[in-house]
Curated annotation (Swiss-Prot):
Organism whose genome encodes this protein: Rattus norvegicus
PANTHER family from the UniProt entry: ALPHA-1,6-MANNOSYL-GLYCOPROTEIN 2-BETA-N-ACETYLGLUCOSAMINYLTRANSFERASE, BETA-1,2-N-ACETYLGLUCOSAMINYLTRANSFERASE II
Catalytic function, reaction form: an N(4)-{beta-D-GlcNAc-(1->2)-alpha-D-Man-(1->3)-[alpha-D-Man-(1->6)]-beta-D-Man-(1->4)-beta-D-GlcNAc-(1->4)-beta-D-GlcNAc}-L-asparaginyl-[protein] + UDP-N-acetyl-alpha-D-glucosamine = N(4)-{beta-D-GlcNAc-(1->2)-alpha-D-Man-(1->3)-[beta-D-GlcNAc-(1->2)-alpha-D-Man-(1->6)]-beta-D-Man-(1->4)-beta-D-GlcNAc-(1->4)-beta-D-GlcNAc}-L-asparaginyl-[protein] + UDP + H(+)
GO biological process: oligosaccharide biosynthetic process; protein N-linked glycosylation; protein N-linked glycosylation via asparagine
Family: Belongs to the glycosyltransferase 16 (GT16) protein family.
Superkingdom of source: Eukaryota
The protein's name: Alpha-1,6-mannosyl-glycoprotein 2-beta-N-acetylglucosaminyltransferase
Amino acid sequence: MRFRIYKRKVLILTLVVAACGFVLWSSNGRQRKNDALAPPLLDSEPLRGAGHFAASVGIRRVSNDSAAPLVPAVPRPEVDNLTLRYRSLVYQLNFDQMLRNVDKDGTWSPGELVLVVQVHNRPEYLRLLIDSLRKAQGIREVLVIFSHDFWSAEINSLISSVDFCPVLQVFFPFSIQLYPSEFPGSDPRDCPRDLKKNAALKLGCINAEYPDSFGHYREAKFSQTKHHWWWKLHFVWERVKVLQDYTGLILFLEEDHYLAPDFYHVFKKMWKLKQQECPGCDVLSLGTYTTIRSFYGIADKVDVKTWKSTEHNMGLALTRDAYQKLIECTDTFCTYDDYNWDWTLQYLTLACLPKVWKVLVPQAPRIFHAGDCGMHHKKTCRPSTQSAQIESLLNNNKQYLFPETLVIGEKFPMAAISPPRKNGGWGDIRDHELCKSYRRLQ
């Protein structure tokens, strides 16, 4: 039997099949993207703290001790679908960088100050910070970037309530929440914190070779903050699109800070004073932890001091030049055995930066630490009590706020400050390498 082939019919049939395939593919692609980016669905399901593990265990020989006995090996954890969807969502949001509360014509650009707030999971304090921002004069001119290491419906709702200034949310892509059962989270194959190194080598846990200076193994909950801070520093200066040609300052805050209503007014005058009378000042700080009761006689005064991590880590403002000098110290920052980002910076001022930092700081603080609980505290959180005390101080001194001019009150001798004894918690080579990698990330 002879078959007759009609080229026109074959061509038409081919085009019809291709069109049907494209429609099916594109509809599935849109559905997958919509599913991945739907906050209500993600927020309605709690993210589990660990993946699912197989019931049986294998046997492996310790690689660094040929004479060691065979030990059970914990299998590599599986990653549940919800965790993968969170990772996908974070990647997409960091790529899209959707600005809110700005004109949609594409002509908006940031002013002379950008705020970057490091946010974990303390919404009660974040609410106070947002309230203080809402009361700040001139805040409509300021871009506020919230950098998160925890996805939360409550926190996202709080950020959505910010309608008084431009807002951008970015997300630390290597958080414990996104890697709950593997590094940089807590891998079940990791060594227990207090296990001795010899015992760890015999056990064969994966980081047995890398305890910290005090013989302890890493704890992810402590490592994360330093990781987040360094990633955020690089990301906002190098990867936030709207800041690519930015020449102003970036003010770094944390979720438990509280700002005075004249902080921006004072900041602009500090910046002008720095340019005119202290060109050698490297950084600006909005205040210290010193308790004061009255702004009388000091509200218009700033001091020039040697930067000290335990005093000047709140409201730290950096220029691009200061950032570029810092980022050149990546290896030193990422290998220094202290899980505190600020104490590590103190070490950099001695070991890597061209000189010790000179800071310009107001005698009457325009920033306050509302968080009396958290990583370094064991107290019960009392945000309402703290905020009431701060508000009382500001109300009692409102006649001294918004000074017309600023003057340098005192210039202290510049001298290197020895960093406090390092705290450890940062001996794991995996932390070192991940930290270094942020500079290479696109």
